Design a protein with these regions (language model features):
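A broad detector of short, well-ordered amphipathic alpha-helices
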Residues: 24, 308, 433-437
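Active-site-proximal binding-pocket segments
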Residues: 221-402, 408
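Short coil/turn segments at secondary-structure junctions
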Residues: 46, 294, 423-426
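Residue-level preference for long, well-ordered alpha-helices that form the structural scaffold
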Residues: 51, 55, 299, 303, ...
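Short, contiguous strand/loop micro-motifs
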Residues: 9-10, 49, 212-213, 297, ...
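Trp/Phe/Arg-rich N-terminal binding region typifying the photolyase-homology
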Residues: 1-158, 249, 358, 441-446, ...
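Glycine/tryptophan-enriched, flexible segments
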Residues: 136-282, 389-456
Length: 456
């Protein structure tokens, strides 16, 4: 009796069963599939502990969805895949296409080693490189026209969920599930496809219709909190886009998804910008060297309560509100005069939802050096941002308990209230008003008030 026809499904950033075109192709290509996740030593070495703990949980939950058939392998990718193809007589390896620099190079190496990769779908509603200017077919460098073309391009409806997946049962030696533990005291969001779908359902029922008004308020549950699920492909952006209507709130949410896709497109077309300045002249600016002030920023002890609350949330939960990401980034670059890469690396170390494109270009947007960037002369005021987006101080009280007893009128500027005990909360490490002017002076030195074309 001949062996059944088999195909390999190589999971990477698509840890789900539903709306997974690559998985459907793998199922269609054979009578049985060999599901595999290959632990990448290089990525593991650079990842933070919370990021890895989340991934470990997600892999076990994916395994449950595959009836305990997920191969979790350690080794060089082409060697692992070649061994599996030989062992199971599998003809094809199915993947979702990756577009980030590392993933692209990895897949090219695997193919160069003679492993046939069948690409179907990607982590995006519209794959990077597909949305181009109709006039000359070049990539967009500004978000707004990109968004218009992205919307016109459109996307497929969510793919069906397979009902009966026949998988090859792995050997025990192929079940190398990592035991990555959270740091003591840390707490992260629930992982897995089921948690992603449950969170999406909750957000649709409780937050989506008010998203345009609530998304910037740090103290409330006003955002989708789906970023980690999107990072690991536990839910696909198609699933989020499909039910959206034309209301202002729904359109605002759709635009936030488009920002993620825009940054992926920018990095795909400018792969060096994960570490380098998109606008090179900003590399010429005078920057300070990291010192104890940088450490205070990392520790959430800058003396600015809104900044400190955000940094403590990041370290404790591996997540931070998008509004506060911008505020702490501006503080690092424009109050402490440090290069954005230092902050981006710290985010990489702690964010559960770390995504190289969104992280690098989110930082460059705030720093003023990126495409479609916030002008460098725009400096977020950490005091006014707190008053505006945490007016009652509830967010600060949650993460800076030293100040929990302060009133809404005093919690944002505790240094003005010397008669109140602040439980050894640190004094300000810089004066924002002074450092804002210093940033503008340094900007004048490079004689630019906005980023220029990186190829100029």
């Amino acid at each position: 009796m001949s062996e059944p026809k088999r195909s390999i499904m190589w999971f990477r950033r698509d840890l789900r069963i539903g709306d997974n075109p690559a998985l459907l192709e793998a199922i269609a290509a054979g009578e049985e599939i060999v599901p595999v996740f290959i632990l990448d030593k290089k990525l593991i070495e650079s990842a933070g502990t919370k990021h890895l703990a989340y991934l470990g949980r997600s892999l076990r939950l994916l395994d449950e969805s595959l009836n305990n058939s997920l191969h979790v392998m350690v080794g060089e990718q082409s060697e692992v895949l070649r061994e599996l193809m030989k062992r199971y007589n599998a003809a094809t390896v199915h993947i979702s296409t990756e577009y980030e620099p590392y993933g692209t190079a990895r897949d090219q190496r695997v193919e160069a080693a003679g492993i046939p990769l069948v690409r179907t779908g990607s982590p995006y509603a519209v794959a990077p490189g597909r949305v181009v200017k109709p006039s000359d077919a070049t990539p967009y460098k500004v978000y707004t026209p990109f968004y218009r073309s992205w919307s016109i391009h459109g996307w497929r409806k969510p793919a069906e969920t397979p009902k009966n997946i026949k998988c090859v049962k792995p050997n025990e030696s192929d079940r190398n599930f990592p035991d990555w533990q959270l740091p003591e005291g840390a707490s992260i969001t629930a992982a897995g496809e089921k948690a992603a779908l449950a969170r999406w359902k909750h957000f649709q029922e409780n937050g989506l219709d008010n998203y345009d008004e609530a998304r910037n308020l740090a103290a409330i549950d006003g955002t989708s909190k789906l970023s980690a699920h999107l990072k690991w492909g536990e839910i696909h952006p198609r699933t989020l886009l499909a039910p959206l209507g034309e209301s202002k709130a729904h359109d605002t949410f759709r635009k936030e998804i488009a920002w993620r896709e825009f940054y992926a497109d920018v990095l795909h077309n400018n792969p060096h910008t994960d570490k380098e300045y998109y606008a090179p002249r900003f590399a010429e600016m005078r920057y300070n060297q990291p010192d104890e002030k940088f450490q205070a920023w990392k520790d959430g002890k800058t003396g600015y309560p809104f900044v400190d609350a955000a940094m403590r949330q990041l370290v404790h939960e591996g997540w931070m509100h998008n509004r506060t990401r911008m505020v702490v980034a501006s503080f690092l670059v424009k109050d402490l005069h440090l290069e954005w890469q230092l902050g981006a690396d710290f985010f990489m170390e702690h964010l559960v939802d770390f995504d190289v494109a969104s992280n690098a270009h989110g930082w460059q947007w705030t720093a003023g050096s990126g495409t479609d960037a916030s002008p460098y002369y725009r400096v977020f005021n950490p005091i006014e941002q707190g008053k505006r987006f945490d007016a009652e101080g509830d967010y600060i009280r949650r993460y800076v308990p030293e100040l929990a007893h302060l009133s809404a009128t005093s919690i944002h500027e505790p240094w003005l209230h010397t008669d109140i005990d602040t439980n050894n909360y640190p004094p300000r490490i810089v004066d924002h008003a002074i450092e804002r002017l210093e940033s503008l002076d340094r900007l004048k030195e490079i004689k630019s008030d906005k980023p220029q074309d990186p190829r100029a």
